[in-house]
Structures are given as C-alpha cells and as structure tokens.
C-alpha cells in the first residue's frame, strides 16, 4: 500500500530542499516528522507539510496503520524559475532567478517491500 502527496511550485530551490529530503528518506514517519520538526531550514517546513499530507492520504484513502508507515520515496525536482530584474549602476541590470521545486513524498507500509 502506498500513498502519495505532492507540493508543486514550492518557493525554495531544489538544491536546498534535497538537503532536507536526504535526511528523512527511508525512515519511519514518526522519526522523519521528529527530524523535520526540529530542523531550522525553511525547506524542512515544506517537506513536513507534504509528509503529513501523505500520511493523511494513507490513513483516509487506504486505511493504513500510521505506526507501520515509512518514507518509501521522496523526490525533489526543479520547477520553473521566475525571472526578475535588479537594477544596477550605470543603467545595467542583473537577472534574479526565483527558483521553485516540486516535492513528492511516497509513504508505504513495511509490507510493500519497496
């Protein structure tokens, strides 16, 4: 049994979100939530919300036991970048990339064999 949750266009860079995702990949959901709760990174709060959504999906849609769930897969892909302009001296301008990420979390019980 698997349950999936996604956060698309999350306002953080994929590189920063992957640092957090690597910490919780493969852990049980209670350990993962504990790590994400006390992490000082902005991306940790985003990943935590997606993980909580995946847990709720597993409980509501599949009737899964929350204690048996673990983080089977967590992926952070790049989303589109918003281009912005910062004016500089002598009429020049620099381009600012406001990056986004797509965060996908899959939780499964131990019987899934993943």
Swiss-Prot record:
InterPro entries: Ribosomal_uL22 (IPR001063), Ribosomal_uL22_bac/chlpt-type (IPR005727), Ribosomal_uL22_bac/org-type (IPR047867), Ribosomal_uL22_CS (IPR018260), Ribosomal_uL22_sf (IPR036394)
Gene Ontology CC terms, in alphabetical order: cytosolic large ribosomal subunit
GO molecular function: rRNA binding; structural constituent of ribosome
BP GO annotations: translation
Swiss-Prot/TrEMBL keywords: Ribonucleoprotein, Ribosomal protein, RNA-binding, rRNA-binding
Domain of life: Bacteria
Pfam families xref list: Ribosomal_L22
Statement: the UniProt record of this protein carries the keyword RNA-binding: yes
Biological function: This protein binds specifically to 23S rRNA; its binding is stimulated by other ribosomal proteins, e.g. L4, L17, and L20. It is important during the early stages of 50S assembly. It makes multiple contacts with different domains of the 23S rRNA in the assembled 50S subunit and ribosome. The globular domain of the protein is located near the polypeptide exit tunnel on the outside of the subunit, while an extended beta-hairpin is found that lines the wall of the exit tunnel in the center of the 70S ribosome.
Family: Belongs to the universal ribosomal protein uL22 family.
Complexes and interactors: Part of the 50S ribosomal subunit.
PANTHER family on file: CHLOROPLAST 50S RIBOSOMAL PROTEIN L22-RELATED, LARGE RIBOSOMAL SUBUNIT PROTEIN UL22M
NCBIfam families associated with the record: rplV_bact
Protein name: Large ribosomal subunit protein uL22
Organism: Aeromonas hydrophila subsp. hydrophila (strain ATCC 7966 / DSM 30187 / BCRC 13018 / CCUG 14551 / JCM 1027 / KCTC 2358 / NCIMB 9240 / NCTC 8049)
Organism classification: Bacteria, Pseudomonadati, Pseudomonadota, Gammaproteobacteria, Aeromonadales
């Amino acid at each position: 049994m698997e349950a999936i949750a996604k956060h698309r266009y999350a306002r953080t860079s994929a590189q920063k979100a992957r640092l957090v995702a690597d910490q919780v990949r493969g852990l049980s959901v209670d350990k993962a939530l504990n790590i994400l709760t006390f992490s000082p990174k902005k991306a940790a709060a985003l990943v935590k919300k997606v993980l909580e959504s995946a847990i709720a999906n597993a409980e509501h849609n599949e009737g899964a036991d929350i204690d048996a769930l673990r983080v089977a897969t967590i992926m952070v892909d790049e989303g589109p970048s918003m281009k912005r302009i910062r004016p500089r001296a002598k009429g020049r301008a620099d381009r600012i990339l406001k990056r986004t990420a797509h965060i996908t979390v899959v939780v499964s019980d131990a019987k899934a064999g993943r």
